[in-house]
Amino acid sequence: SILPGETYQVEAALNNPTIEELRAAGTEYPKWVTDKYLQLPENFSQPIRSLALEITANAETPYDQAFAITQYLRTNIKYSPTIPTAPRGTDRLEWILFEHKQAYCVYYASAEILMLRTLGIPARMAVGFSQGTGTTPGEGFAGEVEEIEVNTFTVRKENAHAWPEVYFPGVGWVEFEPTGNQAPLDRPLAPREDDSPT
């Protein structure tokens, strides 16, 4: 564990496929993906299945279906850091989607994953941390004076987060962000000219 005052640095290479690439990925999913990431509970909620079909009625590709569900959740379910207990005998996710209309990240992610799976699109939950708070260059941690690089963020336990990932053949797992209090993902439509090989 990290003690107060301690810091560590993480560097990562992020894959940010274009919308064009995701739309063109198709549906030739490997068996190891479909065996595990299309599973649904027995007697899964018919109202949630119907909602998934309604939301994605005009979506032509798995990417467009995932994006439509993401947008629906961001627009129709208000973020709340706490959720009361659902009425006895009620499916909690159904209650959140159709009555309570408030959720936090785990419920946003669960709703998107389960709706995608009802459509035959492999999806899974990822957990970790959101971006945290940006630090201004030259600003230190906990009052210390030290040089901080641009694009440095402070991440705390309240930044714990969950989000759905969707599988695209030839691309792999791609994150989506349905949680209403998080910034939407910025995914390029097509490769920029300066991204092409020289």
How should these model regions be labeled?
Residues S1-E99:
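Acidic low-complexity segments
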Residues Q71, V106-D195:
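Hydrophobic/aromatic-rich core segments of domains that either
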Residues L97-Y107:
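Active-site loop and adjoining helix of the penicillin-binding protein/serine DD-peptidase-beta-lactamase fold
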